[in-house]
Design a protein with these regions (language model features):
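A short acidic, Gly/Pro-enriched loop at the edge of an enzyme's catalytic core
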Residues: 71-82
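Short alpha-helix
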Residues: 135-149
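Class I SAM-dependent methyltransferase SAM/SAH-binding core
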Residues: 28-72
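Short, glycine-/aromatic-enriched active-site segment of Class I SAM-dependent methyltransferases
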Residues: 116-134
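A short glycine-rich, Lys/Arg-flanked "PGG" loop and its adjoining helix->strand segment in the class I
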Residues: 96-111
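A short SAM/SAH-binding and catalytic strip from SAM-dependent methyltransferases
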Residues: 82-94
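Conserved alpha-helix/loop element of class I SAM-dependent methyltransferases that forms part
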Residues: 1-17
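C-terminal helical/coil "lid" or tail adjacent to the Rossmann-like core of SAM-dependent
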Residues: 157-179
């Protein structure tokens, strides 16, 4: 399903069910709610879009949602054992600032799990007509951002199954033919 890659990453991360987890770019809260459904009891979703946060709060009253900018998270240093971001980091303006904030709010030994689109090469990447693909970087570009923010170990893998379906749906929704 939609959250299969997230579930696999959570399994590998071995977070305790009571670990404080932050989903950055939660939109209307489905990912954060899914974490709660999996038994994680201390989940906070954050998004810059106040309307999306209002919808998330209405749909999932048992989960905490905060309207905030990923570059200026309103949490104390070391507040979270894990940060999750599902197809959201690529659309953040100021990725370096956001990555530094991720590092700041993570507890020592904490993990950031990002699932996002990546470009094949180093250059500015946009897909005319599909806003959520603006700002996509290569894997090397993302790695450089997180290493510069102080992350000690940056692991990456390429998974296509779930994202091919998403990309096809986006293309169809925005009237952009596959190339």
């Amino acid at each position: 399903g939609r959250f299969k890659l997230l579930e696999l990453s959570l399994e590998a991360a071995c977070f305790a069910k009571a670990a404080p987890l932050l989903e950055v770019g939660c939109a209307t809260g489905e990912g954060s709610a899914h974490l709660a459904e999996l038994g994680y009891t201390c989940v906070t979703g954050v998004d810059i879009d106040a309307e999306a946060i209002a919808q998330a709060r209405e749909k999932f009253p048992g989960v905490s949602f905060v309207c905030a900018d990923a570059r200026h998270l309103p949490f104390a240093a070391g507040s979270f054992e894990g940060i999750i971001s599902e197809a959201a980091f690529s659309v953040i303006d100021g990725k370096a600032e956001a990555a530094r904030e991720y590092a700041r709010v993570l507890a020592p030994g904490g993990l950031a799990l990002l699932h996002d689109f990546a470009a094949a090469a180093e250059s500015a990447h946009t897909q005319p007509g599909i806003p959520c693909l603006d700002g996509v970087q290569s894997m090397a570009g993302y790695r450089a951002v997180f290493e510069a923010a102080g992350f000690e170990r940056v692991c990456e893998s390429e998974e296509y199954g779930e994202y091919i379906g998403i990309a096809m749906s986006l293309g169809k929704a925005y009237g952009v033919p596959p190339t």
